[in-house]
Amino acid sequence: DVYKRQREEGSGTRDAFTELTGILVKDGDNKTDNTTASAVTINSTEAVITNVKDNDAAIGYISLGSLNDTVKALKIGGVEATADNVKSGDYAVSRPFNIAYKGELSDVAQDFVDYIMSSDGQKIVSDNGYVTVSENAAYSGKKPSGKISVAGSTSVSPVMEKLAEAYQKVNTNAKVEIQTSDSSAGMQSAMGGTCDIGMASRDLKDEEKSALKVETIAKDGIAVIVNNANTCDDLTLDQVKSIYTGETTVWSDIIK
């Protein structure tokens, strides 16, 4: 059997994955997620990796930047899941990493955003397997002091932690605190003012866009992962959809 692993509702990775694969069907304002009820819900990127690593018939989907060699990423339509293929547009399953905030940022939070978008910040983005989005010059901020609270996506969190670590070395007056939940919770926190900056691994929804300012800090693929022992190497988007909607239930239907 194919053991399907999915992310929770509120996960930006789930929102982007279901939309890009056609599992999510839109009819006007109505959206229907046709993921089969037999898919097991898992609440973080790391937990999906662990679950697929420990189950030789499992399939899951994660942030490409979080991929490691304990699991295998499948090609999609013959195209490998790599940052280069995301950048060129050849890899079909990709999405933005967004940060969002309400109104004007504090001096120190704005300085941190300037750092992320600088060539220094974008080097960290690409060094960690994500796709850069800005051609800005090197960071030359005033290094204001203060605290910055960042909250949201488990996909964005790993690169945000690296960015925060590097920024705090450059600006020793700043303290960046990161709380990881999911994209929707991050946007709610930003709208409610309980964090300075929210993180989302998807496009913002209309109600979020109307309340928040948004900036894309990186692009990321969504890797479809299986156990290293699985002999399947390549699926089409339609095959991925057919697994997650419950039409395809056994690997032998795919692996001939």
Name each model-derived stretch:
Residues 1-256:
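Exported/periplasmic ABC-transporter solute-binding proteins
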